[in-house]
Amino acid sequence: MRCPKCQHNGTRVLDSRPSDESRSIKRRRECEKCLQRFTTYETVEERPLLIIKKDGMREEFSSDKMLRGLVRACEKRPVPLETLEKMVLDVERTLRNEGKQEVRSQDVGELVMERLAKIDDVAYVRFASVYRQFKDINVFIKELTELMNKN
């Protein structure tokens, strides 16, 4: 590793520890020449996960976008933000563990709804109404009936 101060190639690691929920390793280093200390982070390089939209367009997976949608569905509901953040991480982990580089948006939506139904019924119906694009009240009532039968 090259020293940022003197550009010398020789450095030694003084300390290593997990960082960012064990997604990276933080290392304290010291230059062997000028004794400058600095920090580096080592992370696994993840391949981008592409979402295939209904119209065939592709866009990179965005955990922020998913979280915004969940926050909107859970507005004025007793669902802690931390619960939603964990759900987003769980969905992303599930998608990445499948090993595919491209995933249909329908599959992502189903994973989200499956988890949201276990957390809050009202938020689930809100999310489903937008995600499944309910066209009329009959579709809405059908979804509510199915939800009530599950419970």
Curated annotation (Swiss-Prot):
Start and end of every ATP-cone domain? 49-139
* Entry's Gene Ontology molecular function annotations: ATP binding; DNA binding; zinc ion binding
Could you tell me what this protein is called? Transcriptional repressor NrdR
Named cofactor requirement(s): Zn(2+)
Protein species of origin? Shouchella clausii (strain KSM-K16)
Which parts of the sequence are annotated with region: Disordered? 1-24
Q: Which GO terms describe its biological process?
A: negative regulation of DNA-templated transcription
**Entry function:** Negatively regulates transcription of bacterial ribonucleotide reductase nrd genes and operons by binding to NrdR-boxes.
PANTHER family assigned to the protein according to its UniProt record, in alphabetical order: TRANSCRIPTIONAL REPRESSOR NRDR
State the free-text cofactor note. Answer: Binds 1 zinc ion.
Q: Which family does it belong to?
A: Belongs to the NrdR family.
Instruction: Note the coiled coil stretches, chain numbering.
Output: none
**Pfam families assigned to the protein according to its UniProt record, in alphabetical order:** ATP-cone (PF03477), Zn_ribbon_NrdR (PF22811)
Q: Where are the zinc fingers (unnamed)?
A: 3-34
Q: Which pairs are disulfide-linked?
A: none
Keyword Chaperone on this protein? Answer: no
Which keywords are on file for this protein? ATP-binding, DNA-binding, Metal-binding, Nucleotide-binding, Repressor, Transcription, Transcription regulation, Zinc, Zinc-finger
Q: Where is the composition biased (Basic and acidic residues)?
A: 14-24
